[in-house]
Amino acid sequence: MTSTPKPLVLIILDGFGHSESPEYNAIFAANTPVYDRLRATQPHGLISGSGMDVGLPDGQMGNSEVGHMNLGAGRVVYQDFTRVTKAIRDGEFFENPVLTGAVDKAASAGKAVHILGLLSDGGVHSHQDHLIAMAELAAQRGAEKIYLHAFLDGRDTPPRSAQSSIELLDATFAKLGKGRIASLIGRYYAMDRDNRWDRVSAAYNLIVDSAAEYTADSALAGLQAAYAREENDEFVKATRIGEAVKVEDGDAVIFMNFRADRARELSRAFVEPDFNEFPRARLPKLAAYIGLTQYSAKIPAPAAFAPSSLDNVLGEYLAKNGKTQLRIAETEKYAHVTFFFSGGREEPFEGEERILIPSPKVATYDLQPEMNAPEVTDRIVEAIEQQRFDVIVVNYANGDMVGHTGVFEAAVKAVEALDSCVGRIVEALGKVGGEALITADHGNVEQMEDECTGQAHTAHTSEPVPFIYVGKRKVTVREGGVLADVAPTMLKLLGLEKPAEMTGTSILVDA
């Protein structure tokens, strides 16, 4: 193939899964003339974005980080969740030199080990089993002061589901005969990723100085008091549990989230000497600050599980073959369409340009369900018309970010906004003879109520995701595709042989 249609646009509809059930399905309820027309007239099917198909444990729902890694890598990427869980099972976790070194340094001086992390069985940013293993490791190595600073979920889990996790950790500490939960705060504060530093400062001050709006005798009592204030898990305000615990000089702090994007801001507050995003009342001289994984090459903190390198991911391979590419998203998903899609690489490849559209500054995205998708689309249409790029990769955050709010009516509006944006891209491509692949990284917005509890469903799902080809070729969509097959499909459309490292295979078959 000597020339290929230009550009090829990969449209990633974040959190946009496929469910046969119409119940509380925002996609089913929305008015989507473009999506309906494409499914009626273009080759389409479903591909898997969860579990073993994306390198997660069997049955585990997909997520944005994992989805974009697989989409860009063209192979199944075994995730940090899986790596850490396996290390715990095999016993290697308890011999990890980064973790044991940090604990030993603090314990030998009679200092405390502070464990930070999302206390959840959601498996998206963390897993409570990993926090339990860390408490066990600290106790085994002689630490007497072990404190868990628990961030509550309610986003990748039901909105009020923290009680069982707290009970599990309380039981763990009782069994160990040492350690306790020292503080509670919702992930809304501790795990911001959009430079809302007022939220992060609340978490930092709680952990470091035990500065809290509320106090409680036990973690369960603190949780029940938050529920009485109408705060779901995600939004629980800073709560000190029992006697005040401060992070002192010589203590070790270990952040047990395995996913990077929502661990960066709080980590920066602990380790950056010239940090100026908010005034730190105190910066303890720690024996160690450890991340379970590498949160960023720019954050000076050792990682217990260092990143494994991925060679010949789509972006790198396009650059090697002289192709130009554009990556575009709004703030909430910018890291996904750049860092994660590039296999954990921060810098652009040669011939790669990036456009970041700031996400709207609203408390929660149900207040502006269209987010800034129209502005993202303006820039894509402009790039298509200019025909400067061979490949454009775009992420639309709406399905996921509005899906996470649990507000059904807002989710319907988000889907309708997406439909309009996709229509504009398809129209622009038609004028220049370009092509598109439309897919998603995981499900979310197609299930907005938990059938078992009747609560709002704010988490991701394990549903398959759509895959639609937009263009003039005579092709069909094969069954059994996974996210790792998308990059090889794109290379086929571009007339490029896939590299040996890509084990995925094209989803499109010549008709």
From Swiss-Prot:
Q: What UniProt keywords are attached to this protein's entry?
A: Glycolysis, Isomerase, Manganese, Metal-binding
Q: Which cofactor does it need?
A: Mn(2+)
Recorded hits in Gene3D superfamilies, A to Z, give: Alkaline Phosphatase, subunit A, BPG-independent phosphoglycerate mutase, domain B
Source species, domain of life: Bacteria
The note describing how and how many cofactors are bound reads: Binds 2 manganese ions per subunit.
- The residues the record assigns to binding Mn(2+) 1 are D400, H404, H460
Active site: residue positions: S64 (phosphoserine intermediate)
What Pfam families does the record tag this protein with?
iPGM_N (PF06415), Metalloenzyme (PF01676)
Which annotated residues bind substrate? H125, R155, D156, R187, R193, R259, A260, D261, R262, K333
- Molecular function, one GO term: manganese ion binding
Give the pathway annotation.
Answer: Carbohydrate degradation; glycolysis; pyruvate from D-glyceraldehyde 3-phosphate: step 3/5
Task: Locate the residues binding Mn(2+) 2.
Answer: D14, S64, D441, H442
Q: Which reaction does it catalyse?
A: (2R)-2-phosphoglycerate = (2R)-3-phosphoglycerate
GO cellular-component term (any): cytosol
User: Which EC numbers characterise this protein's activity in its record?
Assistant: 5.4.2.12
Subunit arrangement? Monomer.
* NCBIfam families documented for this protein: pgm_bpd_ind (TIGR01307)
- Its biological function? Catalyzes the interconversion of 2-phosphoglycerate and 3-phosphoglycerate.
**What name has this protein been given in UniProt?**
2,3-bisphosphoglycerate-independent phosphoglycerate mutase
Q: What gene name is given for the protein in this entry?
A: gpmI
